[in-house]
Curated annotation (Swiss-Prot):
It comes from the Bacteria. Residues 53-280 form the Radical SAM core domain. HAMAP family: BioB (MF_01694). Its cofactor is [4Fe-4S] cluster; [2Fe-2S] cluster. Its EC number is 2.8.1.6. Pfam families: BATS, Radical_SAM. It catalyses: (4R,5S)-dethiobiotin + (sulfur carrier)-SH + 2 reduced [2Fe-2S]-[ferredoxin] + 2 S-adenosyl-L-methionine = (sulfur carrier)-H + biotin + 2 5'-deoxyadenosine + 2 L-methionine + 2 oxidized [2Fe-2S]-[ferredoxin]. Belongs to the radical SAM superfamily. Biotin synthase family. Disulfide bonds: none annotated. It comes from Bordetella petrii (strain ATCC BAA-461 / DSM 12804 / CCUG 43448). This is Biotin synthase. [4Fe-4S] cluster binds at residues 68, 72, 75. [2Fe-2S] cluster binds at residues 112, 143, 203, 275. The lineage of its organism: Bacteria, Pseudomonadati, Pseudomonadota, Betaproteobacteria, Burkholderiales. Catalyzes the conversion of dethiobiotin (DTB) to biotin by the insertion of a sulfur atom into dethiobiotin via a radical-based mechanism. The gene is bioB.
Length: 340
């Protein structure tokens, strides 16, 4: 399949190409389109399915920080690396609710809770289920990321009212072994299958800028797009380099390459929420605007994402206003009268 010969109207169809048909070469052909052509195509696809002026706001809270036994080379929460991050116990329910109310007041529609576990223990899952019920009662969509799930655990989360489960693939199968050794790619796919079988929505994306090649970035997007069905929510993270982790000092990704990744994700997963996630704190307003043009329609709001910095809510509000955009659920700003 030579992507450049396929009409935009065909690429935009949810079932075209068929599930499992996306190969890295197909996605790479999109990456290698001229930049303006790629953005034009992505914007066309985006407008077929979404209001291009609306952005979904999500909030992310670390409910259990640090001490993770995994060796993910990018992660400051790994117990394998000395990053100066102290391990905490599971956050009390009332503290979670306080953070959820603050996120809702800031315009967030979805509240995500993350715990630095390899896999949740049964008694921890009971506590997280209570958090889900309480946050859901506020009227927020709920999402959790707790590591690998065993049989029956996704069903327990579903019964508690969970909307989304996040479990990222991180990178392509080919590059994966360079980043993580303590869990396999198949482990991740198995958890995603359990989430789907339980009837939960899937939030699944990855990280770019870890030293991977463009082909390996294409491999990640192809893998995501070939999930059947592809994820409803696709967070794209730009590596945040943390001193003490093996990836500290990695050469930064070209900003235009990050925009290309957003555009390609939009084209091959036309109905997904493509979310700007970690790494946004160092992005200029111009770069973020290009990402919106490329089809990003969700972002994490709030000062901190798990353990890394993030733009302040007020800065996000000002940016959306300058671009004539608005948060989903909020009324668009009225146009200002021009002076006579």
């Amino acid at each position: 399949m030579h992507i450049s010969t396929i009409p935009v109207s065909d690429i935009a169809k949810p079932n075209a190409p068929a599930a499992g048909a996306w190969q890295a070469d197909d996605v790479l052909a999109l990456y290698e389109l001229p930049f303006m052509d790629l953005l034009y195509r992505a914007q066309q696809v985006h407008r077929q399915h979404f209001d291009a002026s609306a952005i979904q706001l999500s909030s992310l809270l670390s409910i259990k920080t640090g001490g993770c036994p995994e060796d993910c080379a990018y992660c400051p929460q790994s117990a394998h690396y000395d990053t100066g991050l102290a391990a905490d116990k599971l956050m009390p329910l009332e503290d979670v609710l306080q953070a959820a109310r603050a996120a809702q007041a800031g315009g967030a529609q979805r509240f995500c809770m993350g715990a630095a576990w390899r896999s949740p223990k049964p008694h921890h899952l009971d506590e997280v289920a209570e958090m889900i019920r309480a946050v859901k009662a506020l009227g927020l969509e709920t999402c959790v990321t707790l590591g690998m799930l065993r049989d029956g655990q996704a069903e327990q989360l579903k019964e508690a009212g969970l909307d989304y489960y996040n479990h990222n693939l991180d990178t392509s199968p080919e590059f994966y072994g360079s980043i993580i050794s303590t869990r396999t790619y198949q482990d991740r796919l198995d958890t995603l299958a359990r989430v789907r079988d339980a009837g939960l929505n899937v939030c699944c994306g990855g990280i770019v800028g870890m030293g991977e090649s463009r082909r390996e970035r294409a491999g990640l997007i192809a893998q995501l797009a070939s999930l059947d069905p592809y994820p409803e929510s696709v967070p794209i993270n730009n590596l945040v380099q943390v001193e003490g982790t093996p990836l500290a000092g990695t050469e930064a990704l070209d900003p235009f390459e990050f925009v290309r990744t957003i555009a390609v994700a939009r084209i091959v997963m036309p109905l997904a929420r493509v979310r700007l996630s970690a790494g946004r704190e160092t992005m200029s307003d111009t770069l973020q605007a290009l990402c919106f043009l490329a089809g990003a329609n969700s972002l994490f709001c709030g000062d901190v994402l798990l353990t890394t910095g993030n733009p302040q809510v007020e800065a996000d509000q000002r940016l959306l206003e300058r671009l004539g955009m608005h948060a989903e659920g909020a009324l668009p700003a009225l146009p200002q009268a021009t002076p006579a």
